Amino acid sequence: MLLTIPELLDAAQLAEIRRLLADAPFTDGRYSAGADARRVKHNEEVDPSDTRVRALNQLVLMPLYRHETFQAAALPRKLSGAFFARYLPGMQYGAHVDDPVMGPEGGRYRTDVSVTVFIGEPQSYEGGELVVETDFGEQQVKLPAGHAVIYPSSSLHRVSPVTGGERLVAVAWAESMVRDPARRQMLYELYQVHEALRRDNPDAEVTRRAGHVRANLMRMWADV
């Protein structure tokens, strides 16, 4: 399931993120990639040891974690820190699958859900589409600043070459309470049905049953 989250960040948050990134030290993005991805990765990322990263993470990850759609769709158990990536003309990220397990010793997490938050406006760069392979074919994603997209980390994906301007994004990963993406999608669709029923018929028996079914499926599938 590929899902967009519109307007995750507001104008003030975006302005502060851009201010912090303006003079942040960027390093070769290959340093953070696994062995296979390193061969096809060509971008730059903010040095994770830089003092700005803490503030940048708070600006991006707190709104993400609190967002109702993210909670319902990703069912996060853990959320990684964010990587702040820059693509200049000629840079790209070839087709790859994210590493299944990330993080340092003592802080490992399974990557179930990948997140990209767009920091720059789409008209500020040429090319640079995020391309995700899904059951319905390739999906190209290039969203307005402040919007986010989430998709299963098991998906083959790439970033098309940037031919002009500067592509700025934040990327992160969630370990989900439900590791199977098909089950997560089913639970999210049940959530949508239940929310619609609660809005239109809050006291109906079918509303209670829909909530009951979703709760028991979570109990059956959740890994906590």
Swiss-Prot record:
The keyword Iron applies. The keyword Metal-binding applies. GO terms for biological process: DNA damage response; intracellular iron ion homeostasis. GO terms for molecular function: 2-oxoglutarate-dependent dioxygenase activity; iron ion binding; L-ascorbic acid binding. Its cofactor is Fe(2+); L-ascorbate. Residues 78-176 form the Fe2OG dioxygenase domain. It holds the Pfam family 2OG-FeII_Oxy_3. Its EC number is 1.14.11.-. Keywords: Dioxygenase, Iron, Metal-binding, Oxidoreductase, Vitamin C. Binds 1 Fe(2+) ion per subunit. 2-oxoglutarate binds at residue 167. Fe cation binds at residues 96, 98, 157. InterPro entries: Oxoglu/Fe-dep_dioxygenase_dom (IPR005123), PKHD_hydroxylase (IPR023550), Pro_4_hyd_alph (IPR006620), Pro_4_hyd_alph_FE2OG_OXY (IPR044862). It comes from the Bacteria. This is PKHD-type hydroxylase Tgr7_2199.
